[in-house]
């Protein structure tokens, strides 16, 4: 995008299970209402048919559910290799809604103004209350969601990414299926010198939900946490990172079935292939630390 004389081209990827047709339509209408050049949208049916969508919206129906990263990667490639037919890709949850009409224009400006900006994480707010849940602020100091800052990860269903990032470091890790795939991409992007910003003025309305806490969730969270460390961390930090997360998990006093699923996932993370190992440089570890989140937590 840097040095572009014309306005950066923007696309959007939405994955759906086909079970929220009204919310999906409202989201697509909010994208169509954005100021500036129109945004090209691809809706990926992740193992399900895509409900009716407005004219001009492209749809891809996958025969099986590839998981969240797998579905998003299909959406990226629909915009050419690494998504590079466009300059910027938005990733939006199918039950979200862009609250304002200037969000895409703000994205264009942000990426044009800063060559090293790779990813922007939007603020998720409840449409009724306007409140943002702490877990939706992608940093350890989450008490003030109205404060924008540089961060070390981002929200998968409320972000914008420069497609040069995918071209350089690859897409999301398909095999994760669900949980921590954003942090895997974020760490690879940061290691390549890109920056990630959390912007409180770019808002995705999304109803407040409790995160699903079933056995499969606990298993994937633990397995992917191990994979994340094995794939991306310098060897001395792997046991530190996983030890800290084990203590934090135990401190939350999970139920016995949850703990059983978590430890099952932890074992699975060690006993199964995690994909290519590319440990980040120590200077990236230091950068993450300066940004407020050393990769031990």
What residues fall within each predicted segment?
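Non-catalytic, C-terminal membrane-associated alpha-helical segments of glycosyltransferases
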Residues: 220, 236-297
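Short, acidic, metal-binding catalytic loop of nucleotide-sugar glycosyltransferases
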Residues: 29-38
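Glycine-rich, basic loop-to-helix element that forms the pyrophosphate-binding segment
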Residues: 62-81
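A short, conserved alpha-helix in the catalytic core of glycosyltransferases
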Residues: 153-161, 165-170, 175-203
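Conserved donor NDP-sugar-binding/catalytic core segment of glycosyltransferases
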Residues: 97, 101-132
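Short beta-strand-to-loop acidic/aromatic patch adjacent to the donor-nucleotide binding site
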Residues: 85-97
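N-proximal low-complexity "stem/linker" segments adjacent to membrane-targeting elements
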Residues: 1-30
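A recurrent flexible, glycine/aromatic-enriched loop bordering the glycosyltransferase active site
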Residues: 126, 143-161, 183, 213
């Amino acid at each position: 995008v840097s040095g572009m004389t014309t306005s950066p081209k923007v696309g959007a990827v939405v994955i759906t299970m086909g079970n929220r047709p009204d919310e999906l339509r409202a989201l697509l209408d909010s994208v169509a209402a954005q100021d500036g050049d129109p945004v090209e949208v691809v809706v990926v049916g992740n193992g399900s048919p895509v409900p009716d969508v407005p004219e001009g919206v492209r749809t891809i129906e996958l025969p099986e559910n590839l998981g969240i990263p797998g579905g998003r990667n299909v959406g990226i490639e629909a915009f050419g290799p690494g998504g590079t037919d466009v300059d910027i890709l938005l990733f939006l949850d199918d039950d979200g809604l862009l609250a304002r009409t200037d969000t895409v224009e703000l994205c264009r400006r942000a990426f044009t103004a800063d060559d090293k900006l790779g990813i922007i994480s939007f603020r998720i707010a409840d449409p009724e209350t306007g409140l943002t849940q702490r877990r939706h602020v992608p940093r350890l100091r989450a008490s003030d969601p109205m404060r924008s800052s540089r961060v070390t990860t981002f929200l998968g269903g409320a972000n914008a990414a420069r497609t040069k990032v995918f071209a350089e470091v690859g897409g999301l890790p398909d095999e994760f299926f669900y949980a921590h795939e954003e942090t895997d991409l974020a760490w690879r992007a940061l290691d390549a010198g890109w920056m990630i910003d959390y912007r409180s003025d770019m808002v995705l309305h999304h109803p407040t939900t409790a995160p699903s806490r079933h056995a499969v969730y606990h298993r994937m969270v633990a397995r992917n946490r191990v994979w994340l460390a094995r794939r991306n961390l310098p060897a001395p930090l792997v046991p530190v990172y996983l030890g800290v997360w084990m203590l934090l998990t135990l401190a939350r006093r999970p139920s016995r079935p949850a703990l059983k699923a978590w430890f099952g996932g932890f074992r699975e993370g060690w006993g199964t292939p995690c994909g290519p190992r590319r440990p980040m440089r120590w200077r990236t570890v230091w950068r993450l630390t300066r940004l407020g989140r050393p990769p031990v937590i």
